[in-house]
UniProtKB/Swiss-Prot annotation:
Participates actively in the response to hyperosmotic and heat shock by preventing the aggregation of stress-denatured proteins, in association with DnaK and GrpE. It is the nucleotide exchange factor for DnaK and may function as a thermosensor. Unfolded proteins bind initially to DnaJ; upon interaction with the DnaJ-bound protein, DnaK hydrolyzes its bound ATP, resulting in the formation of a stable complex. GrpE releases ADP from DnaK; ATP binding to DnaK triggers the release of the substrate protein, thus completing the reaction cycle. Gene3D superfamilies: 3.90.20.20, Head domain of nucleotide exchange factor GrpE (2.30.22.10). It holds the Pfam family GrpE. This is Protein GrpE. It is found in: Cytoplasm. It comes from Escherichia coli O139:H28 (strain E24377A / ETEC). GO terms for biological process: protein folding. Residues 1-39 are annotated as: Disordered. PROSITE patterns: GRPE (PS01071).
Length: 196
């Protein structure tokens, strides 16, 4: 008897039995997979969620670092700008007594004396030249009278009664003040008018 002719106890050929069993397995598998969730799919979904969260944290971290770098760059630029603007402050403070001395020399000089006129003219030119040079570097003189007292640029020394100047205004300058690029480096010492 050949293998094709061999029959199983039920009367089926072996190939038919294998095919029938395979169809039964295929029919059972879809039902089983519909009822059970593959644990690998859950793990994949969990890992994808963790990855998305990690990417979001990374993006936020990068944005924070970029913002910090930009702020640091701006602060550094401002610091450098201030350093350039106010680098001369110490030097200007050393020059102020010299400028004050030239001012006092002009105040006490006998301008009516013809013998002194050359010296007075020399002092005036020296003072003018020095003030022109410091102005080029942002220094301004505070020496206006009849302006309201400003505590940022004036230091009141005395109150004096006056009919000519409004109360609270600067009546006279005892010592000139100076600013460097808008910042007061020495307040002007002034007398202030008060009502009679």
């Amino acid at each position: 008897m050949s293998s094709k002719e061999q029959k199983t106890p039920e009367g089926q050929a072996p190939e038919e039995i294998i095919m029938d069993q395979h169809e039964e397995i295929e029919a059972v598998e879809p039902e089983a997979s519909a009822e059970q969730v593959d644990p690998r799919d859950e793990k994949i979904a969990n890992l994808e969620a963790q990855l998305a969260e990690a990417q979001t944290r990374e993006r936020d971290g990068i944005l924070r670092v970029k913002a910090e770098m930009e702020n640091l760059r701006r602060r550094t630029e401002l610091d450098i700008e201030k350093a350039h603007k106010f680098a001369l402050e110490k030097f200007i403070n050393e020059l102020l007594p010299v400028i004050d001395s030239l001012d006092r020399a002009l105040e006490v000089a006998d301008k009516a004396n013809p013998d002194m006129s050359a010296m007075v003219e020399g002092i005036e030119l020296t003072l003018k030249s020095m003030l022109d040079v410091v102005r080029k570097f942002g220094v301004e003189v505070i020496a206006e009278t009849n302006v309201p007292l400003d505590p940022n640029v004036h230091q009141a020394i005395a109150m004096v009664e006056s009919d000519d100047v409004a109360p609270g205004n600067v009546l006279g300058i005892m010592q000139k003040g100076y600013t460097l690029n808008g910042r007061t480096i020495r307040a002007a010492m002034v007398t202030v008018a008060k009502a009679k």
